[in-house]
């Protein structure tokens, strides 16, 4: 049954009228899935989450005792933050994850529809399931902030903020009013996650939450902040700027033969000299001498040869294996962002999200006015906040795609090496290190996923073959980052000197894993021992159990969606299809969706028919570890889950190989006229190189708008 746009508009106007009264209820934000394009084509309705969306006014009501005696800032008058919440249909999660994209000024709908949310968007602007969605591990809330970002609005435009302190205050106002509307969420464990410039937002917001908890009256529930999750974060501008040239040399992006290489060296030296001259009372957030290095690096790596395609002129700063047009150099990437824009411009979508189409701006990924205003004349970089947060007991996970240039691994590891917290500087001699594998239970395959380093509440995860947007490249693998925090991984403890191994999988929900494991243990107790002699029966052992597992695996195969590979498929087809996107009619779109569904059914059927017996899988897994990692025959999976708080490994348990970040390993550093300190951490890139596949250059379609300035962080 179709709902007219006029009726939707009327409903939305009534909704907005309620906003000003402070009487909003949870039911006012319910999203009807059938009003969103593409949802009706999803055959497995269990993949469609509960959804809530809309504007939450920052001045909805004063909810703290302290605010009752303070004048409300005019800047928050008629200011509304847009949020979109996703909740699993059948799993009641104890976790609530707030996701923030960076910029500053970039919409968190990137996270919702390109990275970690339950849906991706195809080239026709229609939703389809994201197999690696994080909503199976916790409720997800994506927020467009600060003012001027995405679908958030303010009547006081251009009332843009210039300091992270103000941005943090507004976030607390949002949380107060969010928890007024969703009071049960205050009982959940809160995780604040995000990427890029969210490396500034998240620590500042965490500090603001701690201060808020201290101020509120005893009869009010505190916000139970448990963990911060920062992907490819921009946290320490000075240290990270100094990482650009050494990292580019390490990855063979530049060298002595690069034109204007000497200019790069001088720029690096100029940045270092500026830092050396900074006084202790200097309040600068960043320095132009250092920020200019990335622009210069992009400039000297341009390919101006006559035969080069216009969309392959310069390096993509978010994935150095890719190319882009100049001066975008990554701003046109990923192509899926254009699909998101098409989704939000589809008639009826804005109204379905409980917004008034006449009052919200046309959605765009990033607002550069927000970026230009947020200069932080008062606040200092968030790296200064990390020690206090770590010492307060909050877990912090920093995860990085290893192919990112703008917020690269070296910058993060150098920052950690200088950080002092919980009685030591950098990772201590009690640091725990792991190799990380991802196991696809559907395809019965494994692949190296990255490395994990943990010490004193801080975890650093390097993700193999991933970009600045880890969950975009490695959707289902990236969900393993949450599984590592939730102890939802297998641990293989090794008796050799190499690190232990963590294994994450594509199990759809955490509860499914626990239920399957418990059922297996019960069946083992029931069928594994015969009456009378107490010995196992080879003929009867596990018959019913194996049958049940086979049926479950078949069900999982049918439920699993192949959409995790969509980014590569879309990118491969974009050059041919983009010109036709606007001409596609509804019937063609529906046919495409039906064809895709049929193909997925065939793939699922084929995989189901060739499914390996569960016990054979375990045997193959153990053989793999024995052959590849040198595990002794007596060694097995010693525990199903692991905890970082277990007894630390000894320092001689790790590889002593030198780091590629060490300048002594650079082929082109003989003539350098500056010193770069050795990276104190072992290499995160020296494992599984034979198994890693380097991407080919992927061209961005030439018809994409090239009017962007050099991509922001």
Curated annotation (Swiss-Prot):
Transmembrane regions: 617-637
Biased composition (Acidic residues): 512-522, 553-601, 668-678
Alphabetical list of Pfam families matching this protein: Peptidase_S10
Principal location class: Golgi
Composition bias type Basic and acidic residues, residue spans: 523-552, 602-612
Low complexity bias spans: 651-667
EC number: 3.4.16.6
Subcellular location per the Swiss-Prot or TrEMBL entry: Golgi apparatus, trans-Golgi network membrane
Leader sequence segment: 1-22
Topological domains annotated Cytoplasmic: 638-713
Lumenal compartment spans: 23-616
GO biological process: apoptotic process; proteolysis
Positions annotated with a glycan in the UniProt record: 457, 465
Catalytic activity: Preferential release of a C-terminal arginine or lysine residue
GO MF entry, a single one: serine-type carboxypeptidase activity
Mode of membrane association: Single-pass type I membrane protein
Gene Ontology cellular component terms for the protein in this record: membrane; trans-Golgi network
SUPFAM superfamilies listed in its UniProt record: alpha/beta-Hydrolases
Ranges of compositional bias, category Basic residues: 686-695
Annotated family: Belongs to the peptidase S10 family.
UniProt-listed PANTHER family: PHEROMONE-PROCESSING CARBOXYPEPTIDASE KEX1 (PTHR11802:SF190), SERINE PROTEASE FAMILY S10 SERINE CARBOXYPEPTIDASE (PTHR11802)
Physiological role: Protease with a carboxypeptidase B-like function involved in the C-terminal processing of the lysine and arginine residues from protein precursors. Promotes cell fusion and is involved in the programmed cell death.
Protein name in the entry: Pheromone-processing carboxypeptidase KEX1
Native species: Vanderwaltozyma polyspora (strain ATCC 22028 / DSM 70294 / BCRC 21397 / CBS 2163 / NBRC 10782 / NRRL Y-8283 / UCD 57-17) (Kluyveromyces polysporus)
């Amino acid at each position: 049954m179709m709902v007219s746009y006029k009726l939707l508009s009327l409903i939305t106007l009534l909704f907005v009228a309620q906003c000003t009264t402070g009487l909003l209820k949870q039911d006012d934000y319910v999203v009807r899935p059938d009003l969103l394009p593409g949802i009706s084509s999803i055959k497995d309705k269990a993949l469609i989450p509960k959804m809530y969306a809309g504007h939450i006014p920052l001045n909805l009501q004063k909810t703290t005792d302290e605010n009752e005696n303070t004048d409300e800032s005019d800047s928050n008058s008629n200011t509304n933050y847009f949020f979109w919440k996703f909740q699993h249909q059948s799993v009641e999660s104890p976790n609530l994850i707030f996701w923030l994209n960076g910029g500053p000024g970039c919409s968190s709908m990137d996270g919702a529809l390109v990275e970690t949310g339950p849906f991706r968007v195809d080239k026709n602007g229609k939703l389809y399931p994201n197999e690696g969605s994080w909503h199976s591990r916790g409720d997800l809330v994506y927020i467009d902030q600060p003012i001027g970002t995405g679908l958030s609005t303010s009547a006081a435009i251009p009332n843009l903020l210039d300091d992270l302190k103000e941005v943090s205050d507004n976030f607390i106002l949002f949380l107060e009013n969010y928890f007024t509307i969703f009071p049960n969420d205050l009982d959940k464990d809160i995780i604040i996650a995000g990427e890029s410039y969210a490396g500034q937002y998240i620590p500042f917001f965490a500090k603001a939450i701690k201060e808020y908890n201290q101020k509120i009256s005893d009869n009010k529930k505190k916000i139970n902040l448990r963990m911060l999750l920062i992907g490819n974060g921009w946290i320490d501008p000075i240290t990270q700027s100094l990482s650009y040239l050494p990292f580019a040399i390490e990855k063979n992006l530049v060298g002595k033969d690069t034109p204007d290489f000497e200019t790069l060296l001088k720029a690096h030296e100029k940045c270092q000299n500026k830092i050396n001259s900074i006084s202790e009372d200097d309040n600068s957030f960043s320095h132009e001498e250092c920020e200019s290095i990335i622009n210069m690096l992009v400039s000297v790596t341009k390919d101006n040869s006559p035969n080069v395609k216009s969309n392959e002129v310069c390096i993509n700063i978010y994935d150095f294996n890719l190319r882009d047009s100049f001066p975008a150099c990554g701003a046109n990437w990923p192509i899926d962002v254009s699909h998101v824009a098409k989704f939000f411009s589809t008639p009826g979508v804005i109204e379905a999200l409980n917004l008034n189409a006449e009052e919200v701006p046309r959605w765009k990924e990033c607002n550069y006015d927000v970026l230009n205003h947020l200069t932080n004349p008062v606040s200092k970089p968030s790296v200064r906040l990390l020690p206090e947060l770590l010492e307060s007991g909050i877990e912090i996970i920093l995860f990085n795609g290893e192919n990112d240039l703008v917020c690269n691994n070296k910058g993060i590891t150098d920052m950690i090496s200088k950080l002092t917290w919980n009685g030591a500087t950098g990772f201590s001699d009690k640091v725990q290190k792991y190799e990380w594998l991802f196991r696809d239970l559907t395809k019965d395959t494994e692949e190296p996923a990255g490395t994990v380093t943990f010490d004193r509440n801080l975890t650093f995860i390097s993700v193999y073959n991933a970009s600045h947007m880890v969950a975009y490249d490695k959707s289902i693998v990236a969900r393993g980052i949450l599984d590592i925090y939730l102890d939802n991984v297998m641990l293989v403890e090794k008796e050799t000197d190499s690190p232990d191994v963590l294994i994450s999988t594509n199990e759809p929900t955490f509860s499914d894993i626990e239920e399957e494991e418990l059922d297996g243990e019960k069946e083992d107790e029931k069928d594994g021992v015969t009456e009378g002699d107490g010995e196992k029966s080879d003929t009867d052992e596990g018959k019913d159990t194996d049958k049940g597992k086979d049926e479950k695996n078949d069900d999982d195969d049918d439920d699993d969606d192949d959409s995790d590979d969509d980014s590569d498929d879309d990118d491969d087809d974009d050059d041919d299809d983009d010109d036709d996107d606007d001409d596609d009619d509804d019937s063609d779109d529906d046919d495409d969706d039906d064809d895709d569904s049929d193909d997925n059914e065939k793939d699922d059927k084929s995989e189901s028919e060739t499914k390996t017996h569960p016990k054979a899988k375990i045997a193959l897994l153990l053989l793999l570890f024995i052959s590849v990692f040198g595990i002794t025959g007596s060694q097995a999976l010693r525990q199903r889950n692991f905890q970082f708080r277990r007894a630390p490994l000894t320092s001689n348990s790790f590889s002593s190989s030198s780091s590629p970040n060490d300048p002594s390993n650079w082929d082109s550093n003989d003539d350098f006229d500056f010193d770069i300190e050795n990276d104190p951490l072992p290499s995160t890139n020296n494992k599984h190189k034979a198994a890693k596949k380097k991407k080919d250059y992927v061209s961005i379609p030439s018809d994409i708008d090239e009017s962007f300035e050099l991509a922001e962080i």
